[in-house]
Structure formats: structure tokens, C-alpha cells
A protein has these predicted regions:
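Short, basic/aromatic recognition patches
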Residues: 1-17
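Short solvent-exposed loop/turn micro-motifs enriched in small/polar/acidic residues
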Residues: 11-13, 25-26, 74, 128-130
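Short beta-strand segments
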Residues: 13-45, 61-62
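Beta-strand-connecting loop/turn residues
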Residues: 38-39, 57, 140
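Active-site-adjacent structural patch at catalytic or cofactor/ligand-binding sites
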Residues: 45, 55-64, 71-82
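Short, solvent-exposed aromatic-acidic interface loops
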Residues: 45-48, 101
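Charged, gly/pro-rich active-site loop segments
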Residues: 69-163
Length: 163
């Protein structure tokens, strides 16, 4: 796939698989994301993937579209995780991430509400509200492949900051 095809694919996509690693142990988990040039934005509650990305910010995200065994597309992004904490210097980027993610789906509200409910059940006397955790993956490389009955499989690869 060409660079433009990869970018257009990511702009249409919202579901991918995030790969991270800690102490030579890989971990892959499905995520929802929003794409803007050079970045993927995501939302999470604290857990294993956040712990691991904090210790090793090098990550990959794969997103695909499969119609059948001979007609599919796949884009893999490699990049660097950055947490967007609830602090004034990150507020603009957090707002952008929230706006982009809310445009596409409200799945995170259910997950976030469930996490708050579990917290209240395990700690009934504490009513702490844990703020949502937004993050950015700075895209440093991208490859795309596709297969279609009447086309030749294509691939583009590039490194460094994308423009």
C-alpha cells in the first residue's frame, strides 16, 4: 500500500491491536483509536498495558480489514507511547483526543463506568473517581499490505517523523 493509502485506511479505522513488551515478554491487546496525521489517540483505564507501556514506550499497532482470504488490508504502525496526564500542559491534547474518540464511539464510557463500579464494590467506603487515562502514540514508522483478486499486493515502508 502507498503511504497515502495507509493514512486513508487509518483515518477510516477505529479498532486495532496494540503490541507492547516488558522484560522480553510481548503483550497484545485490542484497542480503539483515533488517527490524526503522525498520531494515534487512545483511552484506557489503568492496567497491564499501561504499566508495560510506561516501562517501555516502544509500541506497535496493527489494524486490518478482512473481507475474505483473498481480499484484505493491514496497516502496522510503530511508534512511541506518551501518556496525556490530567495536567494543564496536556489539556489541549487531552481535549483533542477526547473529541476525536467521542466522534467515533462511546464504548469507553461503558468501560469507564464499569471500572468505577468495580472500584466502589471493592472499596465501598472510598468514593474515589479515577480520571480517564488518555494517551498518544507518536507514529515513527508505518507499513501497509493488501490483497485483492485483481490487484498486486503492495507495500510501503518508511521511518522517522511523518509529514
Amino acid at each position: 500500500m502507498t503511504e497515502m493509502e495507509c493514512r486513508e485506511f487509518l483515518a477510516r479505522s477505529s479498532l486495532g491491536r496494540l503490541a507492547c513488551a516488558r522484560e522480553n515478554e510481548p503483550y497484545i491487546v485490542p484497542i480503539y483509536f483515533a488517527y490524526v496525521p503522525d498520531h494515534l489517540y487512545g483511552f484506557s483505564t489503568f492496567g497491564q498495558k499501561i504499566e508495560w507501556m510506561r516501562s517501555n514506550p516502544r509500541v506497535s499497532v496493527e489494524s486490518d480489514e478482512v473481507l475474505n482470504h483473498s481480499h484484505w488490508k493491514s496497516v502496522i504502525v510503530s511508534g512511541r507511547y506518551e501518556e496525556l496526564p490530567d495536567e494543564p500542559k496536556y489539556q489541549t491534547e487531552r481535549d483533542q483526543a477526547r473529541m476525536l474518540l467521542e466522534k467515533r464511539f462511546l464504548w469507553w464510557q461503558t468501560a469507564y463506568a464499569a471500572m468505577q463500579l468495580r472500584r466502589r464494590q471493592t472499596h465501598p467506603t472510598r468514593h474515589l473517581v479515577v480520571p480517564p487515562l488518555f494517551y498518544c502514540i507518536h507514529i515513527e514508522g508505518m507499513t501497509g499490505r493488501k490483497a485483492a483478486p485483481d490487484s498486486v499486493e503492495g507495500r510501503v515502508g518508511f521511518e522517522g517523523e511523518l509529514t
